Amino acid sequence: MTIIKDIFEQSRDINRTIEKVITYGASQEHRLKSEISEYVVTESIEQQFNDLLLKMQTAMESGGENEVGVWVSGFYGSGKSSFTKYLGLAFDESITIDGVPFINHLKDRFHKQTTKSLLTTVAKRFPASVVLLDLASEMLAGATMADVS
């Protein structure tokens, strides 16, 4: 008789911790390794990465390197935080997991060679400083520190 546990990938502990919420501040190497290894890039997510990277490349090549800003929106739980966190970390050469640049771990999650190549090209040709800002958490932090009279 097959049990549910047998359906899952045998190389991973079914009782492992999987983060429910991806936060920008959690950047310890072991945590990033766990997060990125669990990250499932669907066809739609990969298309969004590809579209954004193409737009970034076009903007940079047309002289708009000082004008690139990105607003990511979506429903609760749709993957906005993981999408932006992993893209941002891919542009930071100092972020590594087991000595391997984070960008390589993200590329391993993609299925299409074109997306992998585009990420490599944009990251190398246009070095960037990435500021990850979670407006909701900033707003909540401000609300908890407000004076009450």
Regions found by a protein language model. Give the residues of each.
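Walker A/P-loop-proximal flanking segment of P-loop NTPase domains
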Residues: M1-S78, K85-F91, D108, V130-L133
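P-loop NTPase motor core
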Residues: V40-S44, V70-F75, S82-S149
